[in-house]
Amino acid sequence: MKRKMLWSSLIVILFVCILFLNKIVDFIINVEWYKEVGYLTVYFTKLIAICKLMIPLFIIIYISIVLYWRSLRLSIIKYRRAFEVNNDKVKNEKRIFIIVNLIVSFLFSYAFAATYWYRILQFNNSVPFNIKDPILNLDVSFYIFKLPLIQSLHSMILSLIIFLGLITLVTYFTLSVKDKVIWRNFKKDSGKIDILNSGITRFAGKQLAVLAALVMICVSIGYILKCIGLVYSQKGVTFGAGYTDAHVSLLLYKIIAAASIISAVIIFISILVSKVKPIIVSITVIVALILIKSLSYTVVQNFIVKSNQKTLEQPYIKYNIDYTRKAFNIENIDANPFQVKDNLTSQDIDNNMDTINNIRINSFEPTLEFYNQVQIIRYYYKFNNIDVDRYNINGKFNQIFIGTREINTKAIDPNTWQNRHLIYTHGYGIVMNKVNSVTSEGQPNFVIKDMPPQNSTDIKLDNARIYFGEKTDDYAIVDTKLKEFDYPKGSENATNNYDGSAGIKLGFINRILFAINQKDINFLLSRDILKESKILINRSIKDRVSKIAPFLNYDSDPYIVMSGGKLYWILDGYTVSDRYPFAQPQNNLNYIRNSVKVTVDAENGNVNFYIMDKSDPIVQSYAKIFPDLFKDINKLPSDIVQHFKYPKDLFNIQCSVLGKYHVTDPGVFYSGEDLWEVAKNQKQVSGEKYSMESSYMVMKLPNEQKEEMILLQYFNMRDKDNMVALFGARMDGENYGKMVLYKFPAEKTVYSPYLFKQKLNQDTTISSQLSLWNKDGSEVQFGDTIIVPINQSLVYVEPMYLRASGKEGIPEMKRVIVSYSDKMVLAESIDDALQQIFSYKQDYNQENSNESQIETPSYDINAEKLKEAKSLYEQALEAQKNGDWSKYGENIKKLGDIIDSLQK
């Protein structure tokens, strides 16, 4: 018997292992990977939290079901007139019940714990915001850290009660059918079964009444949560509680909650004394109160609030404005008037040459296209993206484009397992060009290019290998018998053996595990894998980072920087919530902070998390939960810190919010008379409108002393093309995260990018020139429209590209259109355009002031010399025709003497 039990147990264990084999393998690999990257404690924090939440939940649910099932059995015995005892049947039922209960309890507890593990951690590690909501006077931390767990527990308990109710109903109907079959409660005088008066029916009624009492307690808690949830109401003028919510809904929710508790007590007592009427009355009262609440809300809203909405809703609109601006971190914007004057001089241009010299004439899309046409070197490389940054290059502060040459394993031909995973393991090199400079052909002027990198800057770059990248999705096996391809080198290829620290050792056991994990037998069959070989997994930057810290949100655009001769990725991490009271949601969230900066070593894959915003309570909570996760940002090398950028994803959300919430006066906000939107533009003069993307610029802000990088966006009046403001985020040094807003005069028409395009189209000289270029197999394309504030003036810049028609045409920057005031110039460079705009204005004034001093004899002498030069030229031509080369040379010499005298 014991041997039989042993074999049965072994079979069950083997079956479970096979059933959960993939989960077991994933767990072992995860443990090895988290250990390799140095965040094993973070992984186990999650697992321990799940266990801490799951085990007590499992016990509570299991015991609750056991107790309830026992009460069912006792009730069945009590209310059935006869009860047959079959010991074998009872044992079988007990075994089945235990198995079912274990499964149900496990599923309930695991599903809840796996989904909400971080909520209990946040509940226990909450950090106060020191901001209270204006309705219930609760700290914002309650809504963000505690309320979600309370709501989740409430939903789970209610689901459990409903589940027990279903068990009761199933039991009732099963026994009722059984009674009918065996003719229990048969009335001899009628020959019918009296189901309604049967013991089974009375049993079911009492069991369901007990559950109804528990449901009423849940209803009471639910209405208390509804009171709290009024800060998220969407019934008023703005998000958050309105007048009717605060004066009607809040009161009646409290009354319903209290009445539900009383009803629960009445129902419970009525069960003990076998009274049905009080139960019906109490439930009827609750239903009536709910109907009264709905009716009262409708009456007050339509007959009191609607006709006096602006006055009654004003304080609640103010709450919405204030809390939305706090939640999206736009309450401390440095707003200044910008007069838009037309008084720039050449001296102003000279004083702002560092701004002028960093205006971007290389536009993003054509530059990325050019990178992928000219600098991939081989077809299996790809530039997935280019990033804007700033570097001190040879002593000058320059805005640049930089791109990484990543391996594109899908393009490898032949795409064999060895090629894809053992040979072509990494990308190689970066390409950099200044945004303000092009070659004579109109192509980006590279300062770092080719393979191996040809570097004309003073920026150190010793290791250009990219094992971890934006789109490096495949695993790589390194330190094998095969040499890794490094980069093409003439007729041969340079090779490399990985000497980084990343990777999990591929011993025999791990080869088996990865063969199962990747569903690939090559791990076991390959003769190239050695005992010291390692596998690099999770090589995509975003996947790697989010696997370590999945509770953070991440920016969509990691960017590469050079530091200490190596390459590092920087990725912005956000703490977000959709639970901030009264704050208007945007993109399914209503609180966001750029609280974390993440760096990833492009060769070793080392990941480091740094707290950027120590004032954020959410990141403080995470730091308490995961004490080994975050590092002090002061320990980060300064040459990485100086490349921190304000992230576009966050800025774009703030721009969307600012379009409405730049208004702080509730009356003006209610009237909707000052709404903004992101400015529109066109790719082509006659093309469709599209919303402008925010752009990084190096410039000197008004009243500032030096240039810095700014993330800038332009605003129009909503549904209009008149520009009303410039909005920017600073990011250099101590100014990181500071916001600036420059408002234009309301009475003045300021050209938006779209109006600038229309003005360009109406310029006869420029439009005719564009028409000439835009034919005969050529196509004119416009780059990024840049509007540069200088002092209190605006300068508009539009690069113009020319490309041969067809897919293989390379875009070349041929001209720059510059507009200032009522002047618009088409030139080969910004310098030429500005020279034309400001020099002819200056020369005109000089001519006017010196007009009376011009001497006529001087003019006559020059005219006589020109006449003589013409005569000599004609004589030289005549001598040439006659073959008199002596006379020809004499005339040409005299002509040269006259030209020399005219130049003096």
Swiss-Prot record:
It holds the Pfam family UPF0182. It is a multi-pass membrane protein. It is found in: Cell membrane. InterPro entries: UPF0182. Keywords: Cell membrane, Membrane, Transmembrane, Transmembrane helix. Its main location: membrane. The chain crosses the membrane at residues 9-29, 47-67, 96-116, 157-177, 208-228, 253-273, 279-299. GO terms for cellular component: extracellular region; plasma membrane. PANTHER family: UPF0182 PROTEIN SLL1060. NCBIfam families: PRK00068.1. Belongs to the UPF0182 family. This is UPF0182 protein CKL_0015. The lineage of its organism: Bacteria, Bacillati, Bacillota, Clostridia, Eubacteriales.
